[in-house]
Amino acid sequence: MATTTAEPVTTHPFDPGTKPDLRNPVFQAFIVLRAAFTVAPILFGLDKFAHVLVNWDIYFAPRLDRIVPGTAHQAMYAVGAIEIVAGLVVALRPKYGSLLVAAWLVGIIVNLLLIPGYYDVALRDFGLFLAAVALFRLASAFDRRPLLRR
């Protein structure tokens, strides 16, 4: 009876389950998305206080302004604080931060759909939502730390 030698099992060099490696294009995509969803929310959040890029108050739906206490300007301070926190969570725990950013983007999209003339911005934010979901999927492979350690 002939004996066969089994070939060693190797993983594909771009398997997301492998150790993080900067030569791995899947890991590179994770790094790019993580950096983008760390920096952008923090910068946009800070700008809610400074108004350097734009007057953010115009992006707050008048319907919501009637419901939320205070003015649109005051609401944007809260929005800015939430965005800064979201960016920091992505930096520290991308698996959970990406879900926070995705949920936040859904809220932004709904808000923009309530303002006539901002549908193009809502569509762009939908693209960002999809990228945040992609970051969550990649973080599931590369950020395997549990939320709470025992």
Language model segments and positions:
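Membrane-interface extramembranous regions
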Residues: 2-150
